Amino acid sequence: MPVLWLADVDKNDIPLVGGKGANLGELLRAEIPVPDGFVVDARTFREFIQKTGIAEKIYSLLRELDVEDTEKLDAVSREIREIIEKTEMPEDIEREIREAYRKLCEEEGKEVYVAVRSSATAEDLPDASFAGQQETYLNVVGEDEVVEKVKKCWGSLFTPRAIYYRVQKGFRHEDVSIAVVVQKMVNSEKSGVMFTSHPVSGEKKCIIEAVFGLGEAIVSGLVTPDTYVYDRVKRKIEEVKIGEKKFMLTRKDGKTVKVELPPEKANERVLSDEEIEKLVTLGELIEDHYGKPQDVEWAIEGGKIYIVQSRPITTIRKEKKEAEEEVSEEAEGKILLKGLGASPGIASGKVKVIFSEKEISKVEEGDILVTTMTTPDMVPAMKRAAAIVTDEGGMTCHAAIVSRELGVPAVVGTKVATKVLKDGMVVTVDGEKGIVYEGRIEKKEEPKPVVASAPIITATEVKVNISIPDVAERVARETNADGVGLFRIEHMVLGLEKHPMKFIRDGEIDRYIDLLYQEMKKVVKAFYPKPVWIRTIDAPTDEFRAMEGGEDEPIEANPMLGFRGIRRDLAEEEHFRAEMRAIKKLVDEGYTNVGVMLPLITSPEEVKRAKEIAISEGLPLDKIEFGVMVETPAAALILEDIIKEGIDFVSLGTNDLTQYTLAVDRNNENVAYLYNETHPAVLKLIERTIKVCKEHGVKSSICGQAGSYPHVVEKLVEFGIDSVSANPDAVQRIREVVARAEKRIILEKLRKI
C-alpha cells in the first residue's frame, strides 16, 4: 500500500517514510500538536522507477558522473529529473494518492492547502545533517497538483546538491530512496525554528528564531529573524535580538507571495514572553521524548502553536577542541564586520564575493566566501572555502547549518558583508565571536584547562574508521583516536581513473602500487605510531563495473553476496599481490604500525592462502599485525579454526554480520525495518567472538556502524572487547560511553567484594 497516515508511523518506519515522516509520526504519538497528513512511502518510489523501466537509465547516468564537474552535474541532474517528471505514474499508485488527499479534505469539507515535502531515507538521521537537499512545495491544492508535486519531490532526490552530498557522505545512490509527506498547511501568522539546546556548544539554552508569516524565509536566509535565547537552567529569557524583517512570506490565492513590511513592522518583536515560554515547554517535551536535543520547526495560527517538524541536532560539539585557535587579544586588528557566530573556528584568506551559484567557480581552495546568503547549490564552493560570511540569515539558515556540518567557520547576518568586503581583500573570520577582522590576524592557542578538558582515559581503546586519506591528518588531530580500526581502501581505489585489473593488463602495475602506497601513507603517517588496520579491497561488482575497464565485471543479482572481499582477493591474485607490495613499501619505510585485515572470511583456508601470498611478497608478518573481519556467522562459529592459522586480531563487521545472520538486505526498504544489530542472535555471535578471542590471546575489535551506537558499545565493553572503532564524528561520544561502562563494571565488582 503506497500511502501511510502519519498517525500510524513512528521512528521504526524510517526505511519506509524517511526521517521527516517518521519524526512527524513520533510527534503525533507523543500528543504534540502536529498538522494531519500522510506519507507516500519509499517503496512507492522504487516501484515507480522499476515498473516504468527508468531505474537503470537513472543509475547508469550517475555511475559515470564526476560530481566536481559542476556543469556535468547540473546537466545529469536536469536529465534525470526530466525523465521522472515526464514518466506517467502507474494508475494504482496515482489512485491511492488521490484518495488519501480527498480523505484529508473531508474534515473541512473543501479542498485543503497542503505542504508536499520530500522525506529521504538518509535525511534527518542522527549522523547526517543533509540541510534541506530535497524540495518542499507549499500551498499545494487539488488532487492533480498533489500528484504532480509528488513526482517533483521524487525528482528532487536527484538535484545537483543532493547528488553531491550523497557522494561526499559516502551514500550509494541506489541505497537512498525517498518518501513524500503530504501535510495540511498552517497559514502561519508567525513561524520559525527552535534549537532545544545550543546547536554548537550543547548548553541548555533554547535558541528560537522567529519571523512574521511563513518560516521558509528563515531557512532560505531571505530575512534576518528575531533571535531569542532562553536559559533552561535559570528558567528565564536571557537575550532578545530583533532582526530586520523587511518582508514576510504569506499565502495568497494559493501561492506563496512576498509582502513588503513597513519599517515599524519590520523592526517589531515577533514573539511575546508568553509565546517564548510555551515554545520552550513544547521543545523540552520533544527533547525528552527523543532523548536528545532537537531542531524544531514551529508555526502559530490563531494563537495556537503547531509543530511542523523536528529532527536531531547533528552539529553539537562534545567539548571544545584541544588547542582550539582564538584571535590573540594583542593581535586583534580592525573590526570590519560583526554578525552572528554561526560555526566556530578561525580562518584567514582572500575574499571572493559571489551573488549566485553561477559564480561558484570563482571560489578557490582557502578563499573566504562572501555572499548575500548561500543556497544549497553553493555547497561545492562552501566545501572549498576557508570561511563563510553572509549578509543575511540566523543560526538556522542554510549557511549556518552547512558550515557547522562541514566544520567551516561562518559569520552570518552581517547585513553589509557584500558591500564592505571586496574581492582580493585579506581578512580573518572568527566564527565563534561573529567578527570579521581586517588582514591576517595572529592566532593564539587556548590554554588547556587541567580539569575541564582532561583527556578521558579508557582501558578499551577507541579507534576511528577512515575512508578518505585526505582527511586523515585532521581526523587524527581532532579525535586523538587510539588508531584506525578500519581503513577502507576501496573508496580510494574506486576514485582512480581505471579498474585495478586494467592497470595490470596495461602493464602499469608499478604505477598502481605507487598510487596505493601514496594514499595509504597519508593515513599511516598521520596516525603513526598508533595502529592502522588496512582492510583489503571489499567493493562489490556493481561499483567496480562503473570504472574504465570494468566492463567484464560479472552482473550479479545481489552483489553483497557475490564476488567481493577475500573471494576477489584470492581469485584476482595479481591484484591482491599489488596491495601487499604497497603495504610492504610502507613497512620498508619504517611504518610498522600497519596491519592487514582480510574481509568476508568464511574458512581457515582463505586465511592460510592469503598469508602465503603476503609472505611470498616479502611482507614481514613478524613485524606487523595480520587479522580478519568477522562479518559472517560462519566466521564467528568456526573462529577457533581460523585463529589456528595465526592471526593477531579480529574485527567485527556488524553491518554485514547483522544482515547475513537475519537474512535481511539492509538496502531493501521492504525488509530494512527487520535490520537490528541488537537482535539476540547477532549479540550471541558478537559475544562468542569476543570470548574466543580472549581465550586465544587475540585482540578483538568492532568497526561496523554499531561501533558508533552508544547502546551497543556498552554491551561490547561488558563482553570484554579490546577496542571499538567509530566514525570520526562519534569518537568522543563513544569514548565517554566506554568510560562510563568501564566505571560501572568496576563499581559492580567492588559492590560484590
UniProtKB/Swiss-Prot annotation:
Highest taxon of the lineage: Archaea
Keyword line: ATP-binding, Kinase, Magnesium, Metal-binding, Nucleotide-binding, Transferase
Single biological process term from Gene Ontology: gluconeogenesis
Enzyme Commission number, as recorded: 2.7.9.2
Chain sites annotated for binding Mg(2+): E631, D656
Pfam families, A to Z: PEP-utilizers (PF00391), PEP-utilizers_C (PF02896), PPDK_N (PF01326)
Pathway per the UniProt entry: Carbohydrate biosynthesis; gluconeogenesis
KW NAD (keyword) present: no
Domain topic, free-text comment: The N-terminal domain contains the ATP/Pi binding site, the central domain the pyrophosphate/phosphate carrier histidine, and the C-terminal domain the pyruvate binding site.
Record's function text: Catalyzes the phosphorylation of pyruvate to phosphoenolpyruvate.
Name under which the protein is recorded: Probable phosphoenolpyruvate synthase
Organism from which the protein derives: Archaeoglobus fulgidus (strain ATCC 49558 / DSM 4304 / JCM 9628 / NBRC 100126 / VC-16)
Name of the gene encoding the protein in the UniProt record: ppsA
